[in-house]
Amino acid sequence: MANPLYQKHIISINDLSRAELELVLETAAKLKANPQPELLKHKVIASCFFEASTRTRLSFETSMHRLGAAVVGFSDSSNTSLGKKGETLADTISVISTYVDAIVMRHPQEGAARLATEFSGGVPVLNAGDGANQHPTQTLLDLFTIQETQGRLENLTIAMVGDLKYGRTVHSLAQALAKFNGNRFCFIAPDALAMPQYILDMLDEKGIPWSLHSAIEDVVQEVDILYMTRVQKERLDPSEYANVKAQFVLRAADLQGARANMKVLHPLPRIDEITTDVDKTPHAWYFQQAGNGIFARQALLALVLNRDLAL
């Protein structure tokens, strides 16, 4: 069967069908069980981070190296022609695309990754996060982690907590889990950081149940996944940040009565929203989740850059 992801841009999680999501997750599981250090031996991949990143950049670049690819790029756009000389993003991508086989890109501006696809000359662009919009590869590692810990992606109750307005990870994850049957969502956020209406409308259109709550304790005993997010200081004015940052904090005591297999996930970095005593509980799974980023991103790179992938 032909690989449907070969040479495909991955900008939004909505660029992937349910079958394609399942293909990525199946490939990730195979690569986790059976590493392929020469799979991308003759490929060159650009890692272009116009915005600060630790986990996503290092995870992507580690994935590239562990598949044998050569990696070029930057982690600080202020030292590029775009930052120092005023070159446009369009021209930057037009040039980079002549050097490489794929472009992994993070940018603070919503829509920048989609714009890049118009100037990449057919070289696939993988979105590593564009502003508060989309973060599809984080969603892939989230799905991989949920499937590993719960044994399924259907018939789950998922609580999302914290910054649901600017937290691009929860937007992408809600859209992805909406492709699977029987899921239910609980949203716990201050009014100023509520889940965007377009996500709620999407769930309504698909007939997927969701509910709003004011406290973690309201739902902790009924959920399979508790997905925490930090309040993003860089996307709020100081007064708004001070008002909401401590409103939703998870402590170990809050997990009493939780289902035995319930897992607490977090895209990281964690600030104050999960206390360190949670780390010692069997529910804490955010560090394993981060580690799964290697395999999810390896899978995506392998599929995008190999016409016929046989593992």
UniProtKB/Swiss-Prot annotation:
Reaction(s) catalysed (UniProt annotation): carbamoyl phosphate + L-aspartate = N-carbamoyl-L-aspartate + phosphate + H(+)
Family annotation (PROSITE patterns): CARBAMOYLTRANSFERASE
Gene Ontology biological process terms, A to Z: 'de novo' pyrimidine nucleobase biosynthetic process; 'de novo' UMP biosynthetic process; amino acid metabolic process
Keyword Transferase: yes
UniProt-annotated binding residues for carbamoyl phosphate: 55-56, 106, 135, 138, 268-269
Record-linked Gene3D superfamilies: Aspartate/ornithine carbamoyltransferase
Binding sites annotated in the UniProt record for L-aspartate: 85, 168, 230
Alphabetized SUPFAM superfamilies for the sequence: Aspartate/ornithine carbamoyltransferase
Broad EC category: transferase
Enzyme Commission number, as recorded: 2.1.3.2
Pathway: Pyrimidine metabolism; UMP biosynthesis via de novo pathway; (S)-dihydroorotate from bicarbonate: step 2/3
MF-aspect GO terms: amino acid binding; aspartate carbamoyltransferase activity
Role: Catalyzes the condensation of carbamoyl phosphate and aspartate to form carbamoyl aspartate and inorganic phosphate, the committed step in the de novo pyrimidine nucleotide biosynthesis pathway.
Protein family according to the UniProt entry: Belongs to the aspartate/ornithine carbamoyltransferase superfamily. ATCase family.
Identification of the protein by name: Aspartate carbamoyltransferase catalytic subunit
Lineage: Bacteria, Pseudomonadati, Pseudomonadota, Gammaproteobacteria, Enterobacterales
Gene name tied to this protein: pyrB
